[in-house]
Amino acid sequence: MIALIQRVSHAKVEVGQNIVGQIGQGLLVLLGVEKDDDRSKADKLAEKVLNYRIFTDENGKMNLNLQQIGGEILIVSQFTLAADTQKGLRPSFSKGADPELAEKLYQYFSQKCAEKVRVANGQFAADMQVSLTNDGPVTFWLNV
């Protein structure tokens, strides 16, 4: 399971002309689900995302996590994160989970995060437009 996390001052996701998810200060999480992923990996990733210390403390040091700053999470499904780009000039998505498993684990991951912080979501399998202001910029690739 892969999460590309970005520290944001605000972010939103639209489907068509409708805003389906929006947050203020917090994290934009682009979530990719792979074939061998399961709930235990989702638990581990949620724990890491919620506790990853990438927000600045009073001394300007990255020392605080999302919960400590009262931040929010916008979670957007991103199957392209599971792409195999080793060969050729076209990505292969053979490592990605089938849509049914991916959606179940996406929803489960969102629920786990929502136990601790406010969560907004994109729309699974939709063509979305994501807007954000990356604070820093601060971006990390987490893979469990």
Curated annotation (Swiss-Prot):
CDD domains: Dtyr_deacylase. A motif (Gly-cisPro motif, important for rejection of L-amino acids) lies at residues 136-137. It is an enzyme of class 3 (hydrolase). The keyword Cytoplasm applies. One of its GO terms (biological process) is D-amino acid catabolic process. Keywords: Cytoplasm, Hydrolase, RNA-binding, tRNA-binding. It comes from the Bacteria. It catalyses: glycyl-tRNA(Ala) + H2O = tRNA(Ala) + glycine + H(+); a D-aminoacyl-tRNA + H2O = a tRNA + a D-alpha-amino acid + H(+). Pfam families: Tyr_Deacylase. The keyword Transmembrane helix does not apply. It is found in: Cytoplasm. One of its GO terms (molecular function) is Gly-tRNA(Ala) deacylase activity. InterPro entries: Daa-tRNA_deacyls_DTD, DTD-like_sf. SUPFAM superfamilies: DTD-like. GO terms for cellular component: cytoplasm. Its EC number is 3.1.1.96. Belongs to the DTD family. HAMAP family: Deacylase_Dtd (MF_00518). An aminoacyl-tRNA editing enzyme that deacylates mischarged D-aminoacyl-tRNAs. Also deacylates mischarged glycyl-tRNA(Ala), protecting cells against glycine mischarging by AlaRS. Acts via tRNA-based rather than protein-based catalysis; rejects L-amino acids rather than detecting D-amino acids in the active site. By recycling D-aminoacyl-tRNA to D-amino acids and free tRNA molecules, this enzyme counteracts the toxicity associated with the formation of D-aminoacyl-tRNA entities in vivo and helps enforce protein L-homochirality. Homodimer. A Gly-cisPro motif from one monomer fits into the active site of the other monomer to allow specific chiral rejection of L-amino acids. This is D-aminoacyl-tRNA deacylase. It comes from Histophilus somni (strain 2336).
